[in-house]
Amino acid sequence: MSLTVPPALLEQAQQGAISEEDFLACVRTSLPYAWSVVAGTAEKLNANGGTVEINDDVPQNDKEWGQLFRMMASDSIRAAIERKFGVRLAFQNCCKVAAFAPDATAAYDEFTSMRAQVLNQRPELVDC
């Protein structure tokens, strides 16, 4: 399971639409490690006014790995976070999270290229 959904939010979803604010609160509570990585990366980008901010800290345990994988693999979670922070996210090498300014198309395209994926392989992360 990706998220620990409070009963009230589940009931709301069963009846219709939910607010993005409530959804993000559920994400933040359910995936605290992943939230801290992604939010921190996005906040640094926005504070610096640059085009890209990369966090390549390696998670310390399986729980942290799992949270990061679940967050970055979910289109709805990633899209909601992108809207909240006004960034575009990308993920590489099972732990490298990047936040891009919305207009940083060239940097995003390079980071998400096959070439960049090959160049960023690390032997210690083969089985991450």
PLM regions and their residue ranges:
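Fe(II)/2-oxoglutarate oxygenase catalytic core
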Residues: M1-C128
